[in-house]
Curated annotation (Swiss-Prot):
Organism: Gluconobacter oxydans (strain 621H)
Gene symbol of the encoding locus: mtnB
Gene Ontology BP annotations: L-methionine salvage from methylthioadenosine; pentose catabolic process
Keywords: Amino-acid biosynthesis, Lyase, Metal-binding, Methionine biosynthesis, Zinc
Function: Catalyzes the dehydration of methylthioribulose-1-phosphate (MTRu-1-P) into 2,3-diketo-5-methylthiopentyl-1-phosphate (DK-MTP-1-P).
Any one GO CC term of the record: cytosol
InterPro entries membership: Aldolase_class_II_sugar_metab (IPR050197), Aldolase_II/adducin_N (IPR001303), Aldolase_II/adducin_N_sf (IPR036409), MethylthioRu-1-P_deHdtase_MtnB (IPR017714)
The name this protein goes by in its record: Methylthioribulose-1-phosphate dehydratase
Catalysis: reaction(s): 5-(methylsulfanyl)-D-ribulose 1-phosphate = 5-methylsulfanyl-2,3-dioxopentyl phosphate + H2O
Length: 208
């Protein structure tokens, strides 16, 4: 019976990741093989998309198990190079149950053009999708970090600011990282953030 419960738990995790990948692909947030998705199971195991898979066509076999340090449990599997950014979040907050990373047009362009170290989002009703926000009459900052192929080094830059992040964070010329207590919450936060970034991009284009 215990093994059946374990298998069911893993199957649910795979299903959530596959469905979220399809949703992100439909929205154009994970072009080609970009992006990665993960979730933490009730027993503490971490499921994440394997490296190189198209997120719009994921199957259960495209989801692999990793240790809390980001090492594939099965040595034959290859995890994304950015796996460390997922495990960093899980280690930072035990309440985090899912992490999503996408590469949308709006996130990419805005992150490359913003001169400061954060994008400020203010006055939007959709800000209320984020925990603790009860009004549109507020502003939240989305931290920006320079892209770095050395993921361990990038993680050390991100780490000091994690506790203050309300929206997620954005890597310049790359994409966003968002998370939530479960996959539904993480996906809602991602959709809310991508909507806000699309609005900001449209406003800039209107001014041009």
């Amino acid at each position: 019976m215990q093994n059946l419960k374990v298998d069911e738990s893993w199957g649910n995790a795979c299903r959530q990741i596959v469905q979220a990948g399809q949703r992100m692909d439909q929205r154009g947030w994970v072009p080609a093989t970009a992006g990665n998705l993960s979730c933490r199971l009730p027993d503490g195991r971490i499921a994440i998309t394997r490296s190189g898979g198209h997120k719009g066509f994921l199957t259960d076999s495209d989801v692999i198990e990793i240790t809390p340090d980001g090492v594939p449990v099965d040595p034959a599997n290859r995890a994304s190079a950015e796996t460390l950014l997922h495990t960093q979040l899980y280690a930072h907050d035990p309440a985090i149950g899912a992490v999503l990373h996408g590469h949308s047009v709006a996130a990419t362009i805005l992150s490359m053009d913003e001169p400061s170290d954060a994008i400020t989002l203010a006055g939007y009703e959709v800000l209320k999708v984020f925990e603790g926000q009860t009004t549109h009459d507020t502003s939240l900052e989305l931290p920006l970090f320079h892209n770095d192929q050395d993921i361990a080094r990038l993680a050390t830059v991100v780490a000091p600011k994690l506790s203050d992040m309300r929206l997620g964070y954005l890597i310049r010329g790359h994409g966003v990282y968002v998370w939530g207590k479960d996959m539904f919450t993480a996906l809602a936060r991602l959709e809310g953030l991508e909507f806000l970034l699309a609005c900001e991009l449209a406003r800039l284009q209107k001014k041009a």
